[in-house]
Curated annotation (Swiss-Prot):
Disulfide bonds: none annotated. Forms a cylinder of 14 subunits composed of two heptameric rings stacked back-to-back. Interacts with the co-chaperonin GroES. Keywords: ATP-binding, Chaperone, Cytoplasm, Isomerase, Nucleotide-binding. The keyword Transit peptide does not apply. GO terms for biological process: protein refolding. PROSITE patterns: CHAPERONINS_CPN60 (PS00296). It catalyses: ATP + H2O + a folded polypeptide = ADP + phosphate + an unfolded polypeptide. Pfam families: Cpn60_TCP1. It is an enzyme of class 5 (isomerase). It is found in: Cytoplasm. This is Chaperonin GroEL 2. CDD domains: GroEL (cd03344). Together with its co-chaperonin GroES, plays an essential role in assisting protein folding. The GroEL-GroES system forms a nano-cage that allows encapsulation of the non-native substrate proteins and provides a physical environment optimized to promote and accelerate protein folding.
């Protein structure tokens, strides 16, 4: 395929145009007075959202260079969302500000590599300052406050805080669609572990890249499954029952995997294969935990159970299983409550006997998975569009609350970045282009606060200057237009969100500034339309 190549300033400006188009669409959503963006869908009703990553995903540009620029910024939003569950719009605004200021300096003759080193040094200093400013999240009210800001809804914040209170900080919280209106919190027995589907062909929800099995059987095998011959008798029995199947094994490959994938694609039989978590003895113990939770047995030749002679009565069951590429959540296993309690007591006894900190930590993890349970937040809304948008917002808020517990909280509303940069830059000692690179970061750290002020109908530059002179932790409450103690007023952000947004934005900005050439696919011309008359003669015109 022929390629288009652009060099130097032309290349950088092409990327910048794409970035600006995407960032301008995303940044209008920032802050309590942020606007919404309507996204047209090929099928179904349009979606109305103020979530940065959802908007970024939908933007596809025609110009090849602009398209690459937009894709790079999408990466910032996606990475920040993956790590922290929020901060996508902040990351996009920071990236735009850094690139815009950086390209001005490159055009004026600054050395891009010197700028890059300066940006990296400044970001490290500001990140360190943010973490030192962070306050630990200790109370249920603080968790509720953080989640409320992310979801822009105090009821959601309170329900998430309640859920975290019930299942613990390490517990699992999932969000499900409900047929009834409003929000409900349910606590169910369940477990999550860090292994996802073996093949993406098992996905049942392509938009979220998830596999969801309702009321499945669970095959737990402490062995590798390669031959379809071993699996076939059991598959036939499960198919007759009409239920889907989750296969947990050391590995599933070869013709066994091919058979499962082909049947899933054809719609003949719904199943998913997942590698067993852990290694060695720890894997055996975790498989046994899952077996007790689901009311099944571990199929292992060590205990005289062979796969080819396994019947349905040896399989576990659950109300629901959700599998992503990285993790599996089993909700409401059909195990016997007394057996689960016995297993929990056994693990507690092992923790007391253990001398090794590492073993104790791993046993604590198993205990949390088995005893903690799963909190399910059920979401209902008047319309399908509202339901999807609300569910997405609540999922973001859950991740946000967990991020707050992990690294603490800082003043929200863009204030922490401005004040952390102020404190960090007093200690930085850089010269030449590196000092210019650091100034680019200083300029960019004002951008989120300025944008929040602009969206609230205020003058961004004036607000940023005023906040810089206030006591640390004080800033603008954009909802009321007053200057307040941000943390006391419940306007807070998880330190992890702010830090991730800054680091990811700086990473992409450095790439933009050091780009000297862009190679893009040449757009193909549309083929000419054929003669609609089919070339037949003798027709009257």
């Amino acid at each position: 395929m022929p390629k288009l190549i652009a060099f130097n300033e032309e290349a950088r400006r092409g990327l910048e145009r794409g970035m600006n188009t995407l960032a301008d669409a995303v940044k209008v959503t920032l802050g309590p007075k942020g606007r919404n963006v309507v996204l047209e869908k090929k099928w179904g009703a349009p979606t109305i959202t103020n979530d940065g990553v959802s908007i970024a995903k939908e933007i596809e540009l025609e110009d090849p260079y602009e398209k690459i620029g937009a894709e790079l910024v999408k990466e910032v939003a996606k990475k920040t969302d993956d790590v922290a569950g929020d901060g996508t719009t902040t990351a996009t605004v920071l990236a735009q500000a850094m690139v815009r200021e950086g390209l001005r300096n490159v055009a004026a003759g600054a050395n891009p590599m010197g700028l890059k080193r300066g940006i990296e040094a400044a970001v490290e200093a500001v990140s360190g300052q943010l973490l030192s400013m962070a306050k630990d999240v200790e109370t249920k009210e603080q968790i509720a406050s953080t989640a409320s800001i992310s979801a822009a809804d105090t009821t959601v914040g309170e329900i998430i805080a309640e859920a975290m209170d019930k299942v613990g900080k390490e517990g699992v919280i999932t969000v499900e669609e409900s047929n009834t209106f409003g929000l409900d919190l349910e606590l169910t027995e369940g477990m999550r572990f860090d292994k996802g589907y073996i093949s993406a062909y098992f996905v049942t929800d392509p938009e979220r890249m998830e596999t969801v099995l309702e009321d499945p059987y669970v095959l737990i095998a402490n062995q590798k499954i390669s031959s379809v011959k071993d699996l076939l008798p059991l598959l036939e029995k499960v198919m007759q029952s009409g239920k889907p199947l989750l296969i947990l094994a050391e590995d599933v490959d070869g013709e066994a995997l091919s058979t499962l994938v082909v049947n899933k694609i054809r719609g003949t039989f719904k199943s998913v294969a997942v590698k067993a978590p852990g290694f060695g003895d720890r894997r055996k113990a975790m498989l046994q935990d899952i077996a007790i939770l689901t009311g099944g047995q571990v199929i292992s030749e060590e205990v005289g159970l062979k796969l080819e002679s396994t019947g349905i009565e040896l399989l576990g069951q659950a109300r629901k299983v959700v599998i992503t590429k990285d993790e599996t959540t089993i909700v409401e296993g059909a195990g016997d409550a007394d057996q689960i309690a016995g297993r929990v007591n056994q693990i507690r006894a092992e923790i007391e006997k253990s001398d090794s900190d590492y073993d104790r930590e791993k046993l604590q993890e198993r205990l949390a998975k088995l005893a903690g349970g799963v909190a399910v937040i059920k979401v209902g809304a008047a319309t399908e569009v509202e339901l999807k948008e609300r569910k997405h917002r609540i999922e973001d808020a859950v991740r946000n609350a967990k991020a707050a517990v992990e690294e603490g909280i800082v003043a929200g509303g863009g204030v922490a970045l401005v004040q952390a940069a102020n404190a960090a830059f007093d200690k930085l000692d850089l010269t030449g282009d590196e000092a210019v690179g650091a100034q680019i970061v200083r300029f960019a750290t004002d951008a989120p606060l300025k944008q929040i002020a602009i969206n609230a109908g205020l003058e961004g530059g004036v607000v940023a200057e005023k906040v810089r002179g206030l006591t640390a932790g004080h800033g603008l409450n954009a909802a009321t237009g007053e200057y307040v103690d941000m943390i006391a007023s419940g306007i807070i952000d998880p330190a992890k969100v702010t830090r991730s947004a800054l680091q990811n934005a700086a990473s992409i900005a450095a790439l933009f500034l050091t780009t000297e050439a862009v190679v893009a696919d040449k757009p193909e011309k549309a083929a000419p339309m054929g003669d609609p008359s089919g070339g037949m003669g003798g027709m009257d015109f």
